[in-house]
Amino acid sequence: MSILDYDYIKTLITTNNGEEVSYRWSHGASDMHLGDGLIIYTLINFFKFKVLVCLGSGGGFIPRIMTQARHDLSVEGFYEEVSMEWGDNGSTYLVDAVNGFNGEVDWEDKESLLRRHFHPKFIKDTTENAYYNFFVKQDIKIDLLHIDADHTFEGVKKDFDLYSKIMNKGGIITIHDTDKNYVNNFVEIDGHEGDDLTGPSEFIKTIDKRKFEVMNFFNHGIRKDKPSSTGLTIIRKK
């Protein structure tokens, strides 16, 4: 017996009823392994985070883990309402312009498994417009922010600089694709021009460690015969 429900994981978290969730490999995940998604789940569960925001998601891997973590906290007795949607156990916000920049999404349809089962609040806009015209206007403060949208240095910096202003005290920011060693050793198919992933790894070097705690979770190369994460960096204001 495992502490994890592998049947559930391989049906609804790492696959869409058997079809592999897009880009899950970038999290080091496989059918029965959550990769760095387990770190996101643990942060939400341990700190009882309620307001969760994901900036960019090709396959919806992280948003579904966010919602599952909120749901499980309710089951564990921390909130009265047991729901995948939103209520006293918080909300999951997913921001994506669905413009093909840094990957294609496969969950835009309201009947997609992600939206039908995990019910993220979907904001179809750029991260900058969403910041000023949704989060700021509604005075929403964030417990956990996952940055995985524009992967240029300027894009990552802008998302961090903006959204770090509306984090709750003790809130955590996670940035995906930060392992420079992974990026530098990634092989593309001949003739296919991949997305530029250098921005996240370059940006984290510039974070002021006098103001922020920074912890990197890199596992590239530990098991060369298995998928590994492209890197996850956790940031928290001191």
Task: Set out the residue ranges of the language-model regions.
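S-adenosylmethionine/decaboxylated-SAM
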Residues: D31, Y41-K238
